[in-house]
Amino acid sequence: MAAIGEKLQELEDRGVRLEDLAKNEEFISAVMHASNIALRTHQQEKLEALRNAVLNVAVGQAPDDALQHMFFRWIESLSPLHLRVLKLFQAPASQPGLSMGGLNSVLEHNMPELRGKRHIYDQVWKDLYSSGLVNTENLHVTMSGNGLTAKRTSELGDAFIAFIADPAMAAAR
């Protein structure tokens, strides 16, 4: 959580008043959620997602309370692998020269550590789909090259990715 303090200092340097945040109930709730989750993980990707979520609340780039609650729950329950797969399929890159195939080939091309581990990535995908974060149920349907590079995250998935993204990076886009 020290990283949050450093980033808050950067926000103060850019004009965010920390006194106002100290009185902001939404921000205080976000810090409490993030702190509780952070105490139960050592995974750097999750700690970074928590830091970014709190910072997005601080700068007013967060969804309503109901979505924030869901998003914090997903940060806690999804693995770093889930987060990487979700981000990959927001803008998937296919193998050069691949004219058709399944999304599993895109996954294995971009994440070679998952080659031959269908039992793992199928479960990860099932979790993402059942949470409504991706819009395609199955990784193993044959499709065209254009289909392989089509965005697979849902509107909810995009909102979740934005919530756990560094607000400084989002502002730079």
Report the location of each language-model feature.
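Charge-rich, amphipathic alpha-helical segments
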Residues: 1-61
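Long, helix-rich, hydrophobic modules that act as membrane-proximal anchors or helical bundle/coiled-coil regulators
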Residues: 40, 44-173
